[in-house]
Amino acid sequence: MRNTRTTITLSAATVLAAGTAVLMPGVAQARPSAVACNETALVVAVTAANAAGGGTVTLTPGCTYTLTASHGNDGVNGPAGLPVITAPITLEGNANTITRAGTASAFRIAQVGTTGGLTLKAVTLSGGHAAASGHNNGGGILNFGAVTLTGSHLSGNTADGLGGALSSTGTASAATLTSSTVKNNTAQQGAGIASVNGTLTLTSSVVNANAATVNPGGIYYAAGSATLNTSTVTANTPTNCTASPSPVPGCIG
């Protein structure tokens, strides 16, 4: 236990020295100042949280973090703007946006590994583009672990494969959206969300105005479980959920 605490404390000190702020699990700390409003500070903070086994990264209120390059690649699934999430990490936002620069090469915003968890609170992810040959799912987020959105938004992301905003894949994968929106994303199929063999739960959330080349445009669901609680899937093209490999309970059109 003593060694674990030492490692986390040193990681926290490293992060603070870099001008960023991370709350590490299991260590008593005063709430730190927010991560500086720039790409480097955000990448350093996420890297430190991964190394510490998880943590909360507090973002500068109202800041748009613009990613100009990929900072994550597991060598299999193509590039991601943020370091691959390998531990439970919360991005604590306040009207924040994390976006790919329009002049940057194609990469999704985030990838969550099987051991990882990404929680977004009041954060928008936009501009991600999954285009790697054969690994082009999840323009906003590619998830193999756990993704939780609370009061957050996925918009303007593109996947050349499945899941323009979010692709969640594998029996261990879980995607939970509460009071969140998935809008104006594009993909080959499932321009809003693609969930394959995992658990998908939407509560008081909206999947709207997403456009796919092939049905369905809103939610692509294949096995696992899907639950819509007081949520709407509307105005997606060509369809909302029709032609999904498995029916999406409560989704019409």
Predicted regions located by residue number:
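Right-handed parallel beta-helix
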Residues: 94-97, 119-129, 148-158, 174-186, ...
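Secretory targeting and sorting signals
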Residues: 1-30
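Extracellular beta-strand/beta-solenoid scaffold signature
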Residues: 76-80, 103-111, 133-142, 159-169, ...
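Glycine-rich repeat segments that build the extracellular carbohydrate-interaction surface of secreted
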Residues: 33-36, 50-71, 88-94
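The right-handed parallel beta-helix/beta-solenoid scaffold, focusing on the short coil/turn
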Residues: 55, 63, 80, 87-89, ...
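Extracellular beta-strand solenoids
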Residues: 59, 67, 84, 93, ...
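Extracellular beta-strand-rich solenoid/capping regions of secreted or surface-exposed proteins
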Residues: 47, 68-90, 99-121, 129-145, ...
